[in-house]
């Protein structure tokens, strides 16, 4: 397994619309395993393939259990996802491994139902609510070249751009 480099905003790579996965082979399995290792090392709960430079419609989500630990066997590997149903509305404070250090409230569906494939190309259906529903929507957005900061109000977006410039200035002087 290998740690992969996470691509950061404002890289144009993050705006790529990912392509459907067609080969469910050992290479794909290795990519999923590397993505999981990278996500855990980066203290994230979700990671889309495009965030590590792979323009493929796949993502992983591994929510921590009540003890705060993310168990590998709980990791969802979601390939070629499609929304079947969505419902409700909620605000959730989101962050992103590609936009480190910035968190903001984003409006999301409260519940989602998706169809996807696992690493063995088996078709699955998943109903999710609350944090899992938010994470699924956030990661699927990545597959479509959309970041959570794109969903902010104009005022919050200006605040984000200002904070980003200040952070970049600070990093140049370190």
Swiss-Prot record:
Cofactor: binding comment: Binds 1 Fe(2+) ion.
First and last residue of the signal peptide: none
One biological process term in Gene Ontology: co-translational protein modification
Domain of life: Bacteria
Entry keywords, A to Z: Hydrolase, Iron, Metal-binding, Protein biosynthesis
Molecular functions per Gene Ontology: metal ion binding; peptide deformylase activity
InterPro entries per UniProt: Peptide_deformylase, Peptide_deformylase_sf
Catalytic activity: N-terminal N-formyl-L-methionyl-[peptide] + H2O = N-terminal L-methionyl-[peptide] + formate
Positions with a binding annotation for Fe cation: 96, 138, 142
Name the UniProt record assigns to this protein: Peptide deformylase
Organism: Helicobacter pylori (strain ATCC 700392 / 26695)
Higher taxonomy: Bacteria, Pseudomonadati, Campylobacterota, Epsilonproteobacteria, Campylobacterales
Gene name for this UniProt entry: def
